[in-house]
Amino acid sequence: MARSPDPKGSGGLSQRQLRVGEQVRHALAQVLQRGEIRDDLIAHTVISVSEVRMSPDLKIATCFITPLGNADTQAVIKALAANAKFIRGRMAPSLSQMKYMPEFRFRADTSFDNFSKIDALLRSPEVARDLGHDDEEDREADKASRNGDE
């Protein structure tokens, strides 16, 4: 029996994948915050873990990270990948309820870049003019519907 499409648009992830992904994200953030990784680049960089997507069998965790500050994203990803087994071992106690510890894959989180592009587009004069025009039309339609109700 096939699953019905997810109406919330979560990318087809199951509730279990979402829950476990959030637990892994929290545990990874704790390991990074405590500074347990002995790598100069990671130790001197604040790293934001925005999302962790679990594979359907929960054996692969794709971690989306953003280094804050002037750190080179690709260099941070390489450093995290080089320390993935150490990170996995440090996270094991806090994820002891899992049957298997997942393999970690690190990716750059580009959602912040996408948000800033959309924000810049919305602030552009052309879009602001169009949005202002739509607002005037909406106000006129609201007035017309109110006058019709009376």
From Swiss-Prot:
SUPFAM superfamilies registered for this protein in UniProt: Ribosome-binding factor A, RbfA
Protein task: One of several proteins that assist in the late maturation steps of the functional core of the 30S ribosomal subunit. Associates with free 30S ribosomal subunits (but not with 30S subunits that are part of 70S ribosomes or polysomes). Required for efficient processing of 16S rRNA. May interact with the 5'-terminal helix region of 16S rRNA.
Organism, scientific name: Brucella anthropi (strain ATCC 49188 / DSM 6882 / CCUG 24695 / JCM 21032 / LMG 3331 / NBRC 15819 / NCTC 12168 / Alc 37)
Pfam families per the UniProt record, alphabetical: RBFA
Transmembrane segments: none
Subcellular location: Cytoplasm
InterPro entries membership: KH_dom-like_a/b, RbfA, RbfA_dom_sf, Ribosome-bd_factorA_CS
Quaternary structure and partners: Monomer. Binds 30S ribosomal subunits, but not 50S ribosomal subunits or 70S ribosomes.
Key words, A-Z: Cytoplasm, Ribosome biogenesis
GO cellular component: cytosol
Segments of skewed composition (Basic and acidic residues): 140-150
Region of interest (Disordered), residue spans: 128-150
Main localisation: cytoplasm
Protein name: Ribosome-binding factor A
Family: Belongs to the RbfA family.
Domain of life: Bacteria
GO BP term, pick one: maturation of SSU-rRNA
Gene3D superfamilies named in the record: 3.30.300.20
MF terms (GO), sorted A to Z: ribosomal small subunit binding
